[in-house]
């Protein structure tokens, strides 16, 4: 970047420059190796926070379980998970008292969701623990495998396509004495290559049937697989995150639907809204506290931090909350919602890949899988790892650790927010019955607390009371990491508030630049990011113009498409110069074909092809966008595509950009090395799954796509649709009689084949 950074700060108020102190430029740190150590840390820490609870043994799986609920009240400031049931229930009751009908209405909304949600809801999401293969898979594949196994074991309620019916199968599967599954495995054999006469290793993929008894199946159904969270900025240590299997996901989805519906009605909740809507919500709470404190009162704000939010939460507490929230509802509904917390109370954490050992002297590397940690001699490990393993051993079963207390990251964000808000809600004067009162904001584990009181002593007393109330429900405000300021300056979910929200522009820095999808998408995403930041993040016109120039420069270097009249020599310059010389209207060439950049900050919303269309030579137009040109990628032309952009914190968010299909919208091919591994069988399944879905979409384009109702299979739906369409086309003269007859014949053949099968 050839920009003098000090120029950016000449007229910037100091508080607006906060964003430059964030660790958000450059590449974020990624983890390498296994997450086994981090997972053991999580399991051990969680048990330590609840160590004075009661130990029991799960009768089905034999797993030892620790229950800290209603445990001893804390006597010091150490984080602890001893939530008191009666306190949580009382907080819920007060929340309902100050928001009459909130639980009732949310239950009604959720009941509707439960009855309408289709099972394909579970295909959203990235990596999911696939219990049939005992490893992670894309969500759609994991769901397909689960349903396939269910059907081969006689569980067929899921065929209706409703999520609730799939969950009925899940419940039934847990009562079965055994489940039969298909697993992939790999055979290696040495054979002599005919051509080279050398010995080579041949790998073949096999599928084999395996029976799981009730105990093994339950352990798998209750397992969360763990991985290391990547790309976390500003931290020295990595940490583990969990991905649950398909048995748990559906139940969690409904619980979160209920909690989301409640959060939407709570003014202190930072979820589920985001962006500008969230800022408006927060500004309202601040305004309320400041107006009320004008003359007589002091008002202070704590930028809060909770210690290990997830590890001190407890699924048993969530069960109590759900039982209370749904207390007047039908029995079936209460049962469906109580299953997720019950499963989480019995969860098992999979320890991941295990440890890698290498001997420098003998040049040997060997993997110690997690399953062996229970029995292996500890002399091979260093001190810290040895301590971890010793501590976790009593909890181990088949390479998974029993983890009853605690919630893994990101599982019940909405429900835990409801718990946090219920404590903020207790700050009203009518509840504190004294001169101080509080309010605040809660978004998952992040909070901001605003305390008003006539004097400093009152403020202190209010903060203390809040702190102690939180302890009673298993929330541990960190005294070291929270800080207090006069109201008007605080930070909440990385929004900085100083008499209004300051744009924290550095958060967006990682999403500037060339994404690396293809020339067409990258150009479109790049300008859309700049446009969005002008709208949402105070990116001023001069800086935006500069960002645009830097982006174009970056883009040209990435794709080696410098202007046709430049002196820069690259691998592509010969072809680009040739095109430049034979083009009459040079302004019409796309930047990726060596053309000039016509973007400025006024026309960022127009796709480049549209911007230059009138300027293009006719034959160039014909090559660029011709559907008959084999290089034009034509997935059905959607006018809008989705890109995944990485903001600096939080999950990758999806961003829409305009997509025009041209010769530059190529799709890179899959890496071939996967084809030689045991995952090949899985990849083939995935491709078959993909092909079926694509075919189905051809028959039911999204404009007319109402889900086929009734029990018909995908094939039946497609055949009947083909017949209807063919008849309409024949009667309106769009197709000839022979074509019509041929289509009908194909349809009959397909039905005949299905009958024989």
Curated annotation (Swiss-Prot):
Domain annotation RdRp catalytic: ranges: 286-483
GO cellular component: host cell cytoplasm; host cell nucleus
EC number(s) recorded for this UniProt protein: 2.7.7.48
Keywords, alphabetical: Eukaryotic host gene expression shutoff by virus, Eukaryotic host transcription shutoff by virus, Host cytoplasm, Host gene expression shutoff by virus, Host nucleus, Host-virus interaction, Inhibition of host RNA polymerase II by virus, Nucleotide-binding, Nucleotidyltransferase, Phosphoprotein, RNA-directed RNA polymerase, Transferase, Viral RNA replication, Viral transcription
Top-rank taxon: Viruses
Main location per the UniProt record: host cell
Catalytic activity line of the entry: RNA(n) + a ribonucleoside 5'-triphosphate = RNA(n+1) + diphosphate
PTM notes: Phosphorylated by host PRKCA.
Location of the region described as Promoter-binding site in the Swiss-Prot/TrEMBL record: 249-256
Compositionally biased tracts (Polar residues): 55-64
Phosphoprotein listed as a keyword: yes
Pfam families: Flu_PB1
Region (Disordered): 52-82
GO terms (BP aspect): DNA-templated transcription; symbiont-mediated suppression of host gene expression; symbiont-mediated suppression of host mRNA transcription via inhibition of RNA polymerase II activity; viral RNA genome replication; viral transcription
Subcellular location, record wording: Host nucleus; Host cytoplasm
Annotated family: Belongs to the influenza viruses polymerase PB1 family.
Subunit structure: Influenza RNA polymerase is composed of three subunits: PB1, PB2 and PA. Interacts (via N-terminus) with PA (via C-terminus). Interacts (via C-terminus) with PB2 (via N-terminus); this interaction is essential for transcription initiation.
Protein name as annotated: RNA-directed RNA polymerase catalytic subunit
Provenance organism: Influenza A virus (strain A/Chicken/Pennsylvania/1370/1983 H5N2)
Source lineage: Viruses, Riboviria, Orthornavirae, Negarnaviricota, Polyploviricotina
């Amino acid at each position: 970047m050839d920009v003098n950074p000090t120029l950016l700060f000449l007229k910037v108020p100091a508080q607006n420059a906060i964003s430059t102190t964030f660790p958000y430029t450059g590449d974020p740190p990624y983890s390498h190796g296994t997450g086994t150590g981090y997972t053991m840390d999580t399991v051990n820490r969680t048990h330590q926070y609840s160590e004075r609870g009661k130990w029991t043994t799960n009768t089905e799986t034999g797993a030892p379980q620790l229950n800290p609920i209603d445990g001893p009240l804390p006597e010091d400031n150490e984080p602890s998970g001893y939530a008191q049931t009666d306190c949580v229930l009382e907080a819920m009751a007060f929340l309902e008292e100050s928001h009459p009908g909130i639980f009732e209405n949310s239950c009604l909304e959720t009941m509707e969701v439960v009855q309408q949600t289709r099972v394909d809801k579970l295909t959203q999401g990235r990596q999911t623990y696939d219990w049939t293969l005992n490893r992670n898979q894309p969500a759609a594949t994991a769901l397909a495998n689960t349903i396939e196994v269910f059907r081969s074991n006689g569980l067929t309620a899921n065929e209706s396509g409703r999520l609730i019916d799939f969950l009925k199968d899940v419940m039934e599967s847990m009562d079965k004495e055994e489940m039969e599954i298909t697993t992939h495995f790999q055979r290696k054999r040495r054979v002599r290559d005919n051509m080279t006469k050398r010995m080579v290793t041949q790998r073949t993929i096999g599928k084999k049937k395996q029976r799981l008894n009730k105990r093994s199946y339950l352990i798998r159904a209750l397992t969360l697989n763990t991985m290391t969270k990547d790309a976390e900025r500003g931290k020295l240590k990595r940490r583990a995150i969990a991905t649950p299997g398909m048995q748990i996901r559906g139940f969690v989805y409904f619980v979160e639907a209920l909690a989301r519906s409640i959060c939407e009605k709570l003014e202190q909740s930072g979820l589920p809204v985001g962006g500008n809507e969230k800022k408006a919500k927060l500004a309202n709470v601040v305004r309320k506290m400041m107006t009320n404190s004008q003359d007589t009162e002091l008002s202070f704000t704590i930028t809060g931090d909770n210690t290990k939010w997830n590890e001190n939460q407890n699924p048993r507490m969530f069960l109590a909350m759900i039982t209370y929230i749904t207390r007047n509802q039908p029995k079936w509904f209460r049962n469906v919602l109580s299953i997720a917390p019950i499963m989480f109370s019995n969860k098992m954490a999979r320890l991941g890949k295990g440890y890698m050992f290498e001997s420098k002297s003998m040049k040997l590397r060997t993997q110690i899988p997690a399953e062996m940690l229970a029995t292996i001699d500890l002399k091979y490990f260093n001190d810290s790892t040895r301590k971890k393993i010793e501590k976790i051993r009593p909890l181990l079963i088949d390479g998974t650790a029993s983890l009853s207390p605690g919630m893994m990251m990101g599982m019940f964000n909405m429900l835990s927010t409801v718990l946090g808000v219920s404590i903020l809600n207790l700050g009203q004067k009518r509840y504190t019955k004294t001169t101080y009162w509080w309010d605040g904001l809660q978004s998952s584990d992040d909070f901001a607390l605003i305390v008003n009181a006539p004097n400093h002593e009152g403020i202190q007393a209010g903060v203390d009371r809040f702190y102690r109330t939180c302890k009673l429900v298993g929330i541990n405000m960190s005294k070291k990491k929270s800080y207090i300021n006069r109201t008007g300056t605080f930070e909440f979910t990385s929004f900085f508030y100083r008499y209004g929200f300051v744009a924290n522009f550095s958060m967006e820095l990682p999403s500037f630049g060339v994404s690396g999808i293809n020339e067409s998408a990258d150009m479109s995403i790049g300008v859309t990011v700049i446009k969005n930041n002008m709208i949402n993040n105070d990116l001023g016109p001069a800086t935006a113009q500069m960002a645009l120039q830097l982006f174009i420069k970056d883009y040209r270097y990435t794709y080696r498409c410098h202007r046709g009249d430049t002196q820069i020599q690259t691998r592509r310059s010969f072809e680009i110069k040739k095109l430049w010389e034979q083009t009459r209207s040079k302004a019409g060439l796309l930047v990726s074909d060596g053309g000039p950049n016509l973007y400025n900050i006024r026309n960022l919303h127009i796709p480049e092809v549209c911007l230059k269309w009138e300027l293009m030579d006719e034959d160039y137009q014909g090559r660029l966008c011709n559907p008959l040109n084999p290089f034009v990628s034509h997935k059905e032309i959607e006018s809008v595509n989705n890109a995944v952009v990485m903001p600096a914190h939080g999950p990758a968010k999806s961003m829409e950009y305009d997509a025009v299909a041209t010769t530059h919208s190529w799709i890179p091919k899959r890496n071939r090395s996967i084809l030689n591994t045991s995952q090949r069988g899985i990849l083939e399944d995935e491709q078959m799954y993909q092909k079926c879905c694509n075919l189905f979409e051809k028959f039911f384009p999204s404009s007319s796509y109402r889900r086929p109702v009734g029990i018909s299979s995908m094939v039946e739906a497609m055949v009947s649709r083909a017949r209807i369409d063919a008849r309409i086309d024949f009667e309106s003269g769009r197709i000839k009689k022979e074509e019509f007859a041929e289509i009908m014949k194909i349809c009959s053949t397909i039905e005949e084949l299905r009958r024989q099968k």
